[in-house]
Amino acid sequence: MSTKVEEILWAEKYRPKTLDDIVNQREIIDRLKKFVKEKNMPHLLFAGPPGTGKTTAALALVHDLYGDNYTEYFLELNASDERGIDVIRNKVKEFARTVIPGDIPFKVVLLDEADNMTADAQQALRRTMELYTENTRFILACNYLSKIIEPIQSRTALFRFYPLKKEDVVNRLIYIAKNEKAEYDQKALETIYDITMGDMRKSINILQAASAYGKISVEAVFKVLGLAQPKEVREMINLALQGKFTQARDKLRTLLITYGLSGEDIVKQIHREITSSEIQISEELRVLLLDYIGETEFRIIEGADDEIQLSALLAKMAIYGNKYIGSENR
């Protein structure tokens, strides 16, 4: 990526450059620092959700190993972008054949999204790893460890990356916003975390996009994401719980048509509101509704009609709202 683009993208501009710069995943960072100290390492397997620091940790590791000229010793490949295992194998062969003098007798290949490779491609990758193990170390990054074949897992040191804590993500967003002199609401930053579920890269991208509205507010965040405002989703839910099914369904159609939202988007927002403190209902009712929300999301993902499934969910809310809340509270 060019310097000009890096200056534009906050996610790259504020990416930690060294292991000491990384403030989370402390246990992993401490283990990686030992490799730097020993100037040796095995093949590594980084597993965890998107945006938890897998690529950042790999880049910081090779930077600390080789210094500012680490790019001469480092090859980054993406399993999704490459045209097949033959392309990857040829690139690795070309990369590994040249020897650069120095204290460290090996180069490093980072293969991102390795879990997108077929089992056959992974078997071929395993053979490639064995062929060049004398002067090349592989770092494989994946979102789903279960999709990596056992022969590769057994030949690598596993590092599990866990979702980042809310405090860590929000504090990082505050630091970036202040550094960029961007005005922000604390609630907006917390909302970004809730939406991204701790994906730091996605959180920073949303922060930057929302800053274009002048002030980083909750409204700006939802505009950037193309989602309905939370108050509109809450209004729909409350109408249903009050037994006003027709009005709730009309609100649903507005969200689907006017905002152009997908059923999956809406059901996720409903889930977010039901689990928040904004919707005042009993825990028993909350548990029941969450069960139906899960069923609705599953059916939508499986291909069922968005409006029919969401209308059925609103009908369930109306039925159980009447049962658990009662007409005296309306």
Curated annotation (Swiss-Prot):
Gene name of the encoded protein: rfcS
Organism expressing this protein natively: Saccharolobus solfataricus (strain ATCC 35092 / DSM 1617 / JCM 11322 / P2) (Sulfolobus solfataricus)
Any GO BP: DNA repair
GO molecular function, one term: ATP hydrolysis activity
GO-annotated cellular components: DNA replication factor C complex
Superkingdom of origin: Archaea
InterPro entries named among the record's database cross-references: AAA+_ATPase, ATPase_AAA_core, DNA_pol3_clamp-load_cplx_C, DNA_Rep/Repair_Clamp_Loader, P-loop_NTPase, Rep_factor-C_ssu_arc, Rep_factorC_C, RFC_lid
Assembly: Heteropentamer composed of four small subunits (RfcS) and one large subunit (RfcL). A homotetramer of this subunit interacts with PCNA heterodimer PCNA1-PCNA2.
SMART domains from the UniProt entry: AAA
Pfam families: AAA, Rep_fac_C
Protein name, entry field: Replication factor C small subunit
Primary role: Part of the RFC clamp loader complex which loads the PCNA sliding clamp onto DNA. The complex possesses DNA-dependent ATPase activity.
Family of this protein: Belongs to the activator 1 small subunits family. RfcS subfamily.
Keywords: ATP-binding, DNA replication, Nucleotide-binding
Chain sites annotated for binding ATP: G48, P49, P50, G51, T52, G53, K54, T55
